[in-house]
Amino acid sequence: GSTAVGNEILKCAANNLIPSTVELGGKSPNIYFEDVLDYEDDYLNKCAEGLLLGFFNQGEVCTCPSRALIQESIYDRFLDIVVERSKTIKQGNPLDPETQVGAQASKEQFDKIMSYMEIGRQEGAQILIGGDSANLSGDLSGGYYVQPTLMAGKNDMRIFQEEIFGPTLGVTSFKDEAEALAIANDTDYGL
């Protein structure tokens, strides 16, 4: 759950002297250095796939990457690969084994994700793919489907700092290892 919910749970538990541990959210970064392009084979494909795992299970998994930090020297080329790969993601009925991204868990979560996309736009994020609800046909029409979304921006934007818990990823660039580590650790979560 969110940090705010975890805080409330721990307060209630403490008031009743109940020992408790909670597993909360985060803004885990995947960091891509320029040498990933030295291996234009299965390794590079796995790097792109690792980033796209942020979309699977609708992005509603605590271990999903939610920020991508890409070295400046490969930023455009690596993102081109990721964007092309993202076009093959199948959205649909979560009971279909071919589906990679289904509907969000609730209308509340759907609305939260959509509001963060608007916040990202207002703060100047560039939508690279997605950025809207997904309109599926038939029985799935009107469901809480969100397009897998990549938003390019800066680490001080809310889409980089606050947990969205949906199929959205913030991407930014860095110059060197020191800057990558500074960006990676520049959240309240410290992940």
Mark where each language-model region is.
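ALDH superfamily catalytic-core signature
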Residues: 1-155, 178, 182-183
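A structural signal for short, well-ordered beta-strand elements
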Residues: 106, 170-175
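Glycine-rich nucleotide-phosphate-binding loops and adjacent flexible coil segments
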Residues: 167
